[in-house]
Design a protein with these regions (language model features):
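Charged, gly/pro-rich active-site loop segments
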Residues: 41-110
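Alpha-helix boundary recognition
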Residues: 27-28, 66
């Protein structure tokens, strides 16, 4: 399922409704994969998602989101009672380009 997200502090951050299937699945099994929306030049990251609920970190996530997406959301957007905020710590990443499909695949381990 597509999500808005931000790369910061060596992790991928995003939020989802607390009751969504995405949140429920990650709370049951924290292993996950994240990919870019560009199918011609994809980057795929696999890692572990951790629920974030401390106010200081949520305030930083909100600032990153507002800056990236030019929004003006308030902390209500990340209220832990209604929404889940996750930090995905990457284990590895894989990328390739459509121009050099067979020669460009690259893998990084973190």
């Amino acid at each position: 399922m597509p999500v808005w997200g931000m790369w910061a502090e060596d992790a991928f951050w995003f939020s989802s409704s607390r009751g969504s299937r995405k949140s429920r699945n990650l709370l049951a099994n924290s292993k996950c994969a994240v990919s870019t929306e560009d199918a011609n030049n994809p980057v795929v990251v696999e890692g572990v998602a951790a629920l974030v609920d401390d106010l200081a970190t949520l305030e930083k996530v909100l600032a990153w989101e507002n800056a990236k997406y030019e929004t003006d959301y308030t902390m209500e957007m990340l209220d832990p009672q209604a929404n889940s905020c996750f930090r995905v710590t990457p284990a590895w990443a894989f990328a390739l380009t459509s121009d050099d499909f067979t020669g460009s695949p690259t893998r990084w381990e973190f």
